[in-house]
């Protein structure tokens, strides 16, 4: 029956997403509904403002990131969205002179604060593992689940992405099955940056794995 929902990148609505009001977000949700679409949620969260950062050791910058994250939760909920895909690779990189464990704790602190608001409004933060060539933090589902456990909130879960999983040593069906307790959202984008089935990845085993864990949420095509 075609596409049933749409994901929105906040910076495509306004150059500074902090200026998006809840009323404007509600109108976007209504516009989508009038076209027969549900706003699934948001992605590309920290593209703008460009200085926001998940693992930063700057306390003020971390507070800014928390405030911005809570704002995104509010506009996501106002649109009727239920999920926020947290990728933003450059805005989570760990500097070589930082202690990785301390950086991970800082990330957990940011996400814990935002997740409080998310849980209140029925939104899930879906943390996205990404390939090593994109970022040096959260490069596997396993590493990301470790962070999710540290956050310890039902509103902070896992997002899986076919392109990113293709960079892991484990097979994609294996990752799906091993992560099944945490998966909140799924992107079926091919490593060739086009749609599913246009490259070398075989999607039948992926679909079978999703069915085997009884995944019943959206599968988004990111191209």
Predicted segments, located by residue:
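Short acidic/histidine-rich active-site segments
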Residues: 216-223
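Hydrophobic residues in well-ordered beta-strands that form the structural core
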Residues: 8, 39-41, 85, 127, ...
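N-terminal pre-domain/capping segments
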Residues: 1-82, 112, 119, 153, ...
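Short loop/turn segments at strand-loop or loop-helix junctions that form parts
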Residues: 44-47, 87-90, 223
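Proline-centered loop/turn at the N-terminus of a beta-strand
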Residues: 38, 82-83, 124, 155-157, ...
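Active-site groove signature of glycoside hydrolases
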Residues: 76-97, 121-131
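Glycine-rich tight-turn/loop motif centered on a GG-T
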Residues: 56-62, 93-105
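Acidic/histidine-rich catalytic cores of soluble enzymes
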Residues: 5-6, 11, 102-209
């Amino acid at each position: 029956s075609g596409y049933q929902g749409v994901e929105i990148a906040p910076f495509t609505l306004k150059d500074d997403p902090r200026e998006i009001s809840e009323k404007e977000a509600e109108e976007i949700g209504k516009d989508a509904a009038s076209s027969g679409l549900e706003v699934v949620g948001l992605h590309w969260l920290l593209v703008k403002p460009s200085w926001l950062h998940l693992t930063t050791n700057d306390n003020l910058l971390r507070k800014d990131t928390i405030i911005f994250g809570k704002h995104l939760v509010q506009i996501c909920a106002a649109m009727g969205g239920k999920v926020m895909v947290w990728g933003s690779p450059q805005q989570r990189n760990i500097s070589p002179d930082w202690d990785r464990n301390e950086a991970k704790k800082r990330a957990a602190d940011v996400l814990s604060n935002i997740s409080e608001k998310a849980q209140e409004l029925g939104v899930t933060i879906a943390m996205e593992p990404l390939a090593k060539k994109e970022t040096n933090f959260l490069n596997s589902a396993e590493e990301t689940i470790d962070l999710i456990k540290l956050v310890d909130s039902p509103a902070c879960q896992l997002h899986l992405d076919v392109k990113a999983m293709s960079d892991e040593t484990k097979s994609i069906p294996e990752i799906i099955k091993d992560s099944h307790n945490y998966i909140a959202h799924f992107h079926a984008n091919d490593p060739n940056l086009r749609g599913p089935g246009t490259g070398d990845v075989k999607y039948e085993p992926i679909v079978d794995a999703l069915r085997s864990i009884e995944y019943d949420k959206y599968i988004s095509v990111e191209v």
